[in-house]
């Protein structure tokens, strides 16, 4: 199983453009990466695997329930709005209470970004799955409806059949995006290309599975 080298939680701020040394304008996504606090470590000896639990965006203690208050209290850190666990190669490289910032990554590094895609609501087969539409002529019995769902023999629709339904609002990973700029003072990462989600949504930036081989 592949284990990532490093990762951080962040917030998508929006898109902009960045000019390379050759004067080429490239689209970039600005991500507020951290600061993230290490709330818990998990090791193979105690939990069976290596991972770190990161907290992102502080929030008042009155907005945290009692179990989480105790969890943050045992770690000796302030409560966080978001709490996510990331699998790592070796949890011994981290300490509880350690703060991770944008300078965790370097310019030119290849990363994967995980986020929740924009919700589009209920959508038909053409928009949701890219189906071809039917004839638009006057005599046609269908235009944008899906065709046959199955053969007559099974007398049922198999699971996984592509049909109209809710589009978006799911976990999406975009792989092999290049970091073109790091601003450690403002905890900003400029990542080349688009990142899933709306402005202000939570994203996870982590070492690429394939790009750094």
From Swiss-Prot:
SUPFAM superfamilies: Translation proteins (SSF50447). Keywords: Ribonucleoprotein, Ribosomal protein, RNA-binding, rRNA-binding. GO terms for molecular function: rRNA binding; structural constituent of ribosome. One of its GO terms (cellular component) is cytosolic large ribosomal subunit. PROSITE patterns: RIBOSOMAL_L3. Signal peptide: none annotated. The keyword Electron transport does not apply. It comes from the Bacteria. GO terms for biological process: translation. One of the primary rRNA binding proteins, it binds directly near the 3'-end of the 23S rRNA, where it nucleates assembly of the 50S subunit. HAMAP family: Ribosomal_uL3_B. NCBIfam families: L3_bact. Part of the 50S ribosomal subunit. Forms a cluster with proteins L14 and L19. Belongs to the universal ribosomal protein uL3 family. This is Large ribosomal subunit protein uL3. It comes from Desulforudis audaxviator (strain MP104C).
């Amino acid at each position: 199983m592949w284990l990532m080298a490093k990762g951080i939680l962040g917030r998508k701020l929006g898109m902009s453009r960045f000019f390379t040394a050759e004067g080429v304008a490239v689209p970039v996504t600005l991500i507020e990466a951290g600061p993230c606090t290490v709330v818990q470590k998990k090791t193979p000896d105690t939990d069976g695997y290596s991972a770190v639990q990161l907290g992102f965006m502080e929030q008042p203690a009155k907005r945290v329930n009692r179990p989480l208050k105790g969890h943050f209290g045992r770690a000796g850190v302030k409560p966080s709005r978001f709490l996510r666990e990331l699998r790592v190669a070796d949890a011994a490289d981290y300490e509880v209470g350690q703060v991770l910032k944008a300078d965790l990554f370097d310019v030119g590094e290849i990363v994967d970004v995980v986020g929740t895609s924009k919700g589009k609501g209920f959508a038909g087969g053409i928009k949701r799955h890219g189906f071809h539409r039917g004839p638009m002529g006057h005599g046609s019995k269908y235009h944008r409806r899906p065709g046959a769902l199955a053969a007559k023999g099974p007398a049922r629709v198999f699971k996984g059949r592509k049909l109209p339904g809710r589009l978006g609002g799911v976990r999406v990973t975009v792989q092999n995006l290049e970091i073109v700029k790091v601003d450690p003072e403002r905890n900003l990462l400029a990542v080349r290309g688009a990142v899933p989600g709306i402005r202000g949504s939570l994203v996870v930036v982590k070492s690429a599975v394939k790009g750094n081989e």
